[in-house]
Amino acid sequence: MKPAARRRARECAVQALYSWQLSHNDIADVEYQFLAEQDVKDVDVLYFRELLSGVATNSAYLDGLMKPYLSRQLEELGQVEKAVLRIALFELSKRDDVPYKVAINEAIELAKTFGAEDSHKFVNGVLDKAAPVIRPRKK
């Protein structure tokens, strides 16, 4: 699958996770509704599904990974920033096939697209500290 299709999968995952975080509906229902209502022609749907189920299943674990690096309480995070960070931390901790830099750069781009004005700086700051601990780079 092309990198652009994976990028679109991440974009869709941010939107679906945002909905899930606010609604607290079952993630399978959120996925079904999202796929029924959105144009997913250029999306790696399999990867979208993996991100959704992986983040939902591991959300407490992912939140625990980010907490030490947050400058505020987890509850004070915007829902977009939380979704973006959860996706990046999922990729860093559970998806060795996603290169380190790709996970971080994609998260920054997602925050620029969907987040508040400077949320990409916040996301970058958290991941800059968390990523080397979660997935140490080989020297």
Curated annotation (Swiss-Prot):
Q: Which InterPro entries does its entry note?
A: NusB-like_sf (IPR035926), NusB_fam (IPR011605), NusB_RsmB_TIM44 (IPR006027)
Membrane-crossing ranges are none
Establish whether keyword Cell inner membrane is in the entry. no
Tell me which Pfam families the record gives.
NusB (PF01029)
Which SUPFAM superfamilies does the UniProt record give? Answer: NusB-like
For this record, an example GO cellular component is:
cytosol
Q: A GO molecular function for this record?
A: RNA binding
- Per UniProt, which keywords does this protein have? RNA-binding, Transcription, Transcription antitermination, Transcription regulation
Q: Which GO terms describe its biological process?
A: DNA-templated transcription termination; transcription antitermination
Q: What does this protein do?
A: Involved in transcription antitermination. Required for transcription of ribosomal RNA (rRNA) genes. Binds specifically to the boxA antiterminator sequence of the ribosomal RNA (rrn) operons.
The UniProt entry's sequence similarity note says: Belongs to the NusB family.
Q: What is this protein called?
A: Transcription antitermination protein NusB
Tell me which species this is from. Klebsiella pneumoniae (strain 342)
Q: Which gene encodes it?
A: nusB
